[in-house]
Amino acid sequence: MTFDENPENIFIYHYVEELISSYGSYYESNLNYNDLTLKEFSVLLRIRFQGVATQHDLVELFKVSGAYIAKLLRKFEDNGYIARKEDPENRRKKLVKLTDEGIKKTDELIEVIQNWEDKVTAGISEDEIKTLNEILFKITMI
């Protein structure tokens, strides 16, 4: 199957798929962690950006089961990446926050992400990158 060279005739889906594949390959070749998958790193990174998260927040955000997130949080806790504490406003909820080790781990990932973004945007102007970010933000808010 050949693709039309006119970008207007190609689905956005195709570009997203290509970017995901490109990032996955870059991640695999630049981070050698047998303990965390790319998906698991995404969850760890989200906890970092949120500052504090709940299990429910993560289930909703990643559209996965509560059991999956519970198992993953246990793994993160066992590896020393997160700490959980009781929510003072609702004692049934646990608040999740990165430890110093979790911050160190995500720092390494952020560096890889930045290097990949620099690579894929090398031929794009700062204005185009800004526009791309604005458009992607709008798309993800739907």
Describe the predicted segments one by one:
Residues 21, 25-68:
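N-terminal helix-turn-helix DNA-binding core of bacterial DNA-binding proteins
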Residues 1-5, 126-142:
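C-terminal regulatory/oligomerization modules of transcriptional regulators
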Residues 24, 75-134:
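Charged, amphipathic alpha-helical coiled-coil/dimerization segments
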Residues 1-34:
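N-terminal leader segment of winged-helix/HTH proteins
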Residues 50, 55, 95, 137, ...:
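Alpha-helical transmembrane segments and membrane-interface helix-loop junctions
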Residues 11-14, 42, 57, 130:
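Active-site phosphate/pyrophosphate-handling residues
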